[in-house]
Regions:
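Unchanged
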Residues: 7, 22-121, 125-126, 135, ...
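A conserved hydrophobic position in a structured secondary element of the catalytic/binding core
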Residues: 17, 92, 129
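N-terminal strand-loop-strand
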Residues: 1-17
Length: 147
């Protein structure tokens, strides 16, 4: 996960995952995800092994449909952060991710206070689309463990 830099935008200073808009050179949505991962945090895109696609998530403040993917690399990466976009990397343990408890947080979105599902991870509030993606990952992983 990443902490986005502070900037004039709807995702300023929020916890999320690398990502962005599809570009002409991208051959697929997964290729977009790989490119963004390499650009934002320096993980070599050709080293990432795709596990599966998660459910698309609509993000009202930015009016985007996000198409998340789960992938992994088989080594500890040397992160190279894009300082324009990423403030820091947040690396919770796998155990932490699998044992999250959903809480509710009040957040301000476009001058409107909303109650949204969230998690606390390493003293950071993770909410919105990021929380939805993590929750789906947890459900899928626990299903595999119980199969």
């Amino acid at each position: 996960m990443i902490l986005r830099n502070t900037y004039k935008g709807v995702h300023s200073n929020q916890i999320g995952f690398p990502g962005g808009k599809i570009e002409k050179k991208d051959t697929s949505l997964f290729d977009t995800a790989l490119r963004e991962c390499e650009e934002e945090i320096g993980v070599v895109k050709n080293d990432i092994i795709k596990v599966r696609k998660l459910s698309p998530v609509y993000i009202p403040p930015s009016n985007y449909n996000v198409h998340p993917f789960v992938g992994y690399i088989d080594y500890e990466p040397n992160f190279l952060l894009d300082s324009k976009e990423v403030s820091k990397i947040i690396k919770p343990s796998f155990e932490t991710l699998l044992n999250l408890k959903i809480t509710k947080s009040k957040v301000i979105v476009k001058d409107d206070e909303q109650l949204v599902p969230s998690f606390i991870i390493d003293d950071h509030v993770v909410w919105g689309a990021t929380a939805i993606m993590i929750h789906e990952f947890n459900l899928l992983f626990k299903h595999v463990l119980n199969s």
